[in-house]
């Protein structure tokens, strides 16, 4: 579904990603893990079109993604849940979700999508008229994920969804991602610093360090790798 091949990308001609290749198949849950500064968020910004790569290719369902303007990429079925949630604080919860349903697919499936979102996150239904800026951090993260789902995506990209959350709330977010995948067969690409939880949730993983993929494999393979265990799992 998503093929990233030998991407070099960065800012002001300074590369952050140095020849990164990542493939995500239909229905897969893929995690990209690594330390701060590894280039994980830059990878997502490159897929979304915020950052223009210096070289390499990205295709989505056979379409050359780099030839598509950033504003058009969500219409292909790509939803990006950004780092830091970035909800619209002066809009209500429901209005934020409506903002997510701006694609034709999202508009067509609005009723079923909103029912699914409220089933996954009942607190959003309870607070549908509340301003998003008054929600807790965990509730805002639920809203950000719900907003992504409202577009009826084929690929859901989540950038550090556990950032700044209490452990119990972060665990709930990971459990919900697994449930979303189980219910919808949605393709999920996750960037995350909580390596143990990310690899436990995903089918396949990539370890990104200093802008390069240094390891890849199934979740079981990576969790058993001595380098991953020592560097990220505290074993």
Whereabouts are the PLM-identified features?
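Helix-to-loop junction immediately C-terminal to a conserved catalytic motif
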Residues: 48
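The feature captures the beta-strand-to-loop junction immediately N-terminal to the Walker
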Residues: 33-35
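Conserved ABC transporter NBD signature motif
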Residues: 56-64, 76, 110-114
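ABC ATPase C-loop
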Residues: 148-149
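ABC-type ATPase nucleotide-binding domains, specifically the catalytic core motifs of the NBD
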Residues: 12, 68, 93-112, 120-125, ...
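Helical segment within the ABC ATPase nucleotide-binding domain
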Residues: 171-185
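Conserved ABC ATPase signature
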Residues: 131-135, 139
């Amino acid at each position: 579904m998503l093929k990233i091949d030998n991407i070099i990308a960065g800012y002001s001609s300074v590369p952050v990603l140095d020849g990164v290749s990542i493939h995500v198949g239909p229905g897969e849950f893929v995690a990209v893990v690594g330390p701060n500064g590894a280039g994980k968020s830059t990878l997502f910004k490159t897929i979304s079109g915020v950052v223009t790569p210096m070289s390499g290719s990205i295709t989505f369902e056979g379409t050359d993604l780099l030839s598509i303007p950033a504003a058009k990429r969500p219409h292909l079925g790509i939803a990006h849940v950004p780092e830091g949630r970035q909800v619209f604080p002066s809009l209500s919860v429901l209005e934020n979700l409506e903002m997510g349903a701006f694609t034709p697919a999202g508009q067509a499936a609005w009723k079923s999508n909103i029912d699914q979102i409220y089933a996954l996150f009942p607190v959003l239904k309870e607070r549908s008229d509340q301003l998003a800026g008054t929600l807790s951090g965990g509730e805002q993260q639920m809203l950000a994920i719900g907003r992504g789902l409202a577009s009826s995506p084929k690929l859901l990209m989540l950038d550090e969804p556990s950032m700044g959350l209490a452990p119990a709330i972060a665990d709930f977010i990971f459990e919900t991602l697994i449930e979303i995948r189980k219910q919808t067969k949605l393709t999920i690409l996750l960037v995350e610093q909580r390596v143990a939880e990310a690899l436990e949730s995903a089918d396949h993983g990539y370890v990104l360090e200093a802008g390069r993929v240094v390891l890849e494999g199934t979740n079981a393979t990576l969790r058993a790798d001595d380098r991953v265990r020592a560097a990220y799992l505290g074993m």
